[in-house]
Regions:
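Hydrophobic h-region of N-terminal signal peptides that target proteins for export
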Residues: 5-18
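Low-complexity, glycine/serine/threonine/alanine-rich intrinsically disordered linker
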Residues: 19-51, 65-73, 77-82, 86-269, ...
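Short proline/glycine- and polar residue-rich coil/turn motifs
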Residues: 62-65, 333-337, 369-372
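Hydrophobic core residues within well-ordered beta-strands of beta-rich domains
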Residues: 272, 339-341, 391
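Short, aromatic/His-centered strand-loop micro-motif at the edge of beta-sheets
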Residues: 314-342
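Short tryptophan-centered beta-strand motifs in secreted/extracellular beta-sheet-rich domains
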Residues: 338-347, 354
Length: 868
């Protein structure tokens, strides 16, 4: 069978070139035709018409190539040994191999002749994307609204893709629900987002589910007004001075500023020193940015906060082609006492050192050359959701690593220390008086132009720009209130289809509209948000579609912390993890599954369990591990509560145990019954019923999620299985034996043959996700089976081996999920070649997750360089 996969891959990787059907007529009659006649016609045309497939209608390649959907189904059924059924006469290995090869050729030929083109469907943002887009547009320090799509709450800054490593400890909590949502840092008084339709066998960014009706347009207008008029919007908006602040008035002091380094920093740099005076108003576990230049692995930063169990001061820099970070512990109350403190970080090519009030608090030997070529600015006190709380002043940037003595002198208040080495500085000046060099209207018009560029993801055409600027002029003339007039303009932009619609066409005002379209697709795929300035600049220059530039941007974006949005959105939907919310083991029988009082359900353990597979996914993502580790891995993340649970010794905790802020520790695994996402308690519980595990549901989950092959729903008149404990004990049967009786029904046999082995492989896990060797009836669990009719296994470890033996099939299935998410639509038969090509390109690096993402982006189906 390995030869089949190899030959099929070679066929799929060859150029799409149509063959003359008449030249292949004899091939059909002498090759695949007789094989179909001998093994397939009885069930599909001659005597029966199973699956509504009548193969006798196709007597030539020309006939068959008119139905590429059928060809695809035939390839999948033959490849998985699903056809012919095992009880029927089977073709030889050579015959099966010939059929697969010829059908692959036919499929390629059909696609070459096909006129089918699947355009990117026009769709609106969903709730998750809208919140991210508004937050990024205004660089908000808070969320726009509380949202359950974001399951994991990060409490110790664990998600840091730029490091390429997940920490030993991740302090996290689950999404908050009910009244607890009111406590989350969010804009106050924002109206509810129009309800998104649920995703069934897909993702909630699918264009066929996300339309825009006149009623929705009215809702979005009300929503946009409530955003800019939220009572805490002004203080949370970090673009306030650049957009809303009256230019004739003193700038607001809610933000800080930035430093643009002198060019000599790149020419004559021997190191780096970041120095600042700080007065925190509060200390938090999350990082607080003092100064940061964001440029992928080339970033430079100085911050306070906690990560990996250490709270203190942190310095980071790009050294020798990689990002290096070092933190030194400092007692939080030493900096949070309401007084001014001097902090600094230095790197001299040999060592990174950290200082507080002139005293060295930590050092680490790091040898290498500092990267200095970045053109990005140093942001003061602000980076995404890591703002500085309190006051900053006298921030200095040096092109060399200063000595201990020089740091002591700065901490003592000296102003001219190493002045010749200083390449940038920033000081707060509360006495700055603005000097208007242009009329206020001209300043406002330029602000609006920049706003629309970011909001609409492309330059606004002259007519559109005039519409918004004239509206501002009218509002400002009537009210004389600059801020209110600008908010009216902004709320209109946020309600515009140009903002709300994701796959809208970029304005023809730019000759590079194709690049702007690509920037939008890319940012919504990886960040679930609008493009940043870096993407827009490249789009404006028409460079984004250049392969090397595009690859570089993908690397940058995958190392940006906004990529957490991808993990928060794709992973839970792929795993269908939200099904765990409604899973409810019987309260009386399984009381210890619930936290709370003796007579009420307060909190389910499932809400805690679901963090394990999501953290495992993030580990594979951040560390760019092979996706096979999502099936079987030698690590997992567990809290002490989850560890107790798996060992069957969990106590009944009251609800006051801290479940929204708890440590998950990276745990090595030697027992292969655990590891990966399939056998986590989360998946086992959500695929069970109130009283027992459900092998059919589990098998359906594996088929849908792991192999992207969801089974057809059962007929409406199928009788209940009646497999409760009392019935099974009375009949002396296991669930498996009972199900075998049920599967004798011809209407049920086909699906059960496919999903039953997948579900029974997991039967050693009870409905609570814990291991068992016997059922409660005392009968022994039988988890043996046969995967795709060729991989026999005795238990779940053997099942994992069987899945890994089909890693190419799993990789293609995963790629289908990923591509559907990336394109925001259901895949069709036209997309099969693209899936094969993306998977084939990722194979050489053993299907590493980030590599699959990168190959998806650079493939023509995503960047739309060509149309198939």
């Amino acid at each position: 069978m390995k030869r089949v996969i190899l030959f099929a891959a070679l066929v799929c990787s060859s150029p799409v070139k149509a063959q003359d059907p008449s030249a292949r007529a004899d091939d059909f009659g002498k090759g695949i035709g007789p094989i179909l006649q001998e093994y397939c016609y009885d069930c599909h045309g001659r005597k029966k018409n199973k699956g509504k497939v009548k193969l006798t209608d196709y007597g030539s390649w020309a006939d068959l190539e008119k139905n590429p959907e059928l060809i695809e189904k035939m390839i999948e059924a033959l490849g998985k040994n699903e056809m012919p059924p095992e009880e029927e006469k089977q073709p030889s290995g050579d015959q099966r191999e010939l059929m697969l090869l010829e059908l692959e050729k036919a499929f390629k030929n059909a696609m070459a002749h096909s006129k089918l083109v699947v355009p990117l469907r026009l769709r609106r943002m969903n709730r998750f994307e809208y919140g991210n887009a508004v937050r990024d547009l205004f660089d908000l320090k808070s969320w726009v609204y509380s949202i359950n799509d974001r399951i994991i709450r990060d409490h110790n800054n664990y998600f840091r893709p730029e490091t390429g490593k997940m920490p030993k400890v991740a302090r996290v909590g689950n999404r908050i629900m009910g009244l607890q949502q009111l406590l989350e840092n969010r804009l106050l008084g924002v109206m509810a987002f129009p309800k998104d339709p649920p995703a069934e066998n897909g993702f909630n960014n699918r264009g066929d589910h996300l339309s825009l009706t006149p009623t929705l347009m009215e809702s979005f207008l009300e929503l946009s007004r409530s955003v800019v008029n939220a009572e805490n919007f002004d203080k949370n908006c970090q673009t306030w001075n650049d957009l809303f602040q009256d230019p004739s008035q003193k700038p607001s002091t809610t933000g800080f500023g930035s430093i643009t380094a002198d060019k000599s920093a790149a020419r004559r740099s021997t190191g780096l020193t970041l120095s600042a005076w700080i007065r925190p108003s509060k200390v938090t576990e999350k990082w607080q940015t003092i100064v940061r230049r964001e440029d992928s692995w080339r970033r430079q930063l100085l911050a306070i906060g906690g990560t990996g169990g250490t709270w203190g001061i942190w310095m980071g820099a790009g050294i020798e082609g990689r990002y290096v970070e070092f933190g030194a512990p400092v007692k939080p109350n030493a900096l949070g006492d309401g007084k001014w403190h001097h902090v600094a970080g230095t790197f001299d090519g040999k060592q990174m050192s950290l200082y507080v009030d002139g005293k060295q608090v930590g050092r680490k030997a790091i040898v290498g050359k500092l990267y200095t070529e970045s053109k990005e600015t140093m942001q003061i006190g602000s980076y995404q959701n890591e703002p500085f709380h309190g006051d900053l002043n006298d921030v200095r940037l040096f092109r060399t690593g200063l000595s201990k003595l020089q740091i002591e002198e700065i901490a003592d208040g000296k102003q001219d220390v190493a002045k010749e080495e200083m390449v940038g500085s920033w000081k707060r000046n509360d006495d700055v008086k603005p000097e208007l060099k242009q009329p206020i209207e001209i300043i406002a018009h330029e602000r609006i132009r920049k706003l629309l560029l970011r909001a609409f993801r492309s330059p606004a055409d002259a007519k559109t720009l005039k519409l918004y600027t004239e509206y501002f002029d009218k509002q400002y003339k009537e009210s004389g209130d600059f801020t209110k007039s600008m908010k009216d303009v902004v709320s209109g932009a946020l309600a515009s289809p140009r903002f709300i619609m994701v796959h809208n066409k970029a304005s023809d005002a730019s000759p590079n509209h194709a690049s702007f379209n690509l920037a939008t697709r890319l940012s919504f795929f990886l960040w679930s948000s609008i493009p940043d300035d870096g993407l827009l600049v490249l789009a404006e220059k028409g460079k984004l579609q250049d392969p090397e530039v595009l690859e570089g941007q993908v690397d940058r974006m995958l190392n940006d912390r906004r990529v957490k949005n991808f993990c928060d959105s794709f992973a839970p939907q792929w795993l269908k993890i939200n099904n765990l919310v409604s899973a409810s083991p019987d309260f009386k029988t399984h009381r210890n599954y619930y936290f709370g009082g003796d007579d009420k359900i307060s909190y389910k353990r499932g809400m805690h369990m679901m963090l394990e597979p999501l953290l495992n996914f993030e580990t594979v993502f951040i560390e760019n591990r092979p996706i096979m580790e999502l099936v079987d891995s030698d690590f997992t993340y567990r809290s002490h509560l989850l560890e107790e649970w798996y060992q069957g010794r969990a106590a009944t905790y009251s609800i006051n145990v801290n479940l929204r802020d708890i440590e998950f520790t990276r745990t090595p695994l030697k027992d292969r019954r655990f590891g990966g996402v399939i056998t986590t308690g989360a998946v086992m519980v959500m695929t069970s019923g109130p009283f027992r595990s459900l092998p059919i549901t589990r098998g359906s989950w594996v088929s849908s999620v792991i192999f992207n092959d969801p089974p057809e729903p059962p007929p409406d008149d199928v009788p209940d299985l009646k497999a409760d404990d009392s019935t099974l004990q009375k009949e002396g049967l296991t669930v498996r034996q009972k199900l075998n009786q049920h599967s004798e029904d011809s209407r049920c046999a086909g699906c059960h043959k496919k999903i039953d082995p997948l579900g029974f492989a997991l039967e050693n896990y009870d409905l609570l996700g814990r291991w068992r060797d016997k059922y409660r009836t005392g009968l022994k669990v039988d988890a043996s089976g046969l995967l795709f009719g060729k991989h026999a296994f005795k238990d779940v470890v053997g099942f994992k081996d069987a899945v890994l033996a089909e890693k190419d099939l799993f990789a293609k299935a995963f790629t289908k999920h990923l591509l559907s998410y990336a394109l925001g639509r259901e895949l069709t038969v036209v997309d099969r070649i693209a899936v094969d090509e993306i998977a084939k390109a990722s194979e050489k690096d053993n299907y590493k997750l980030r590599d699959i993402i990168k190959h998806t982006v650079i493939h023509p189906i995503f960047n739309q360089k060509i149309k198939r």
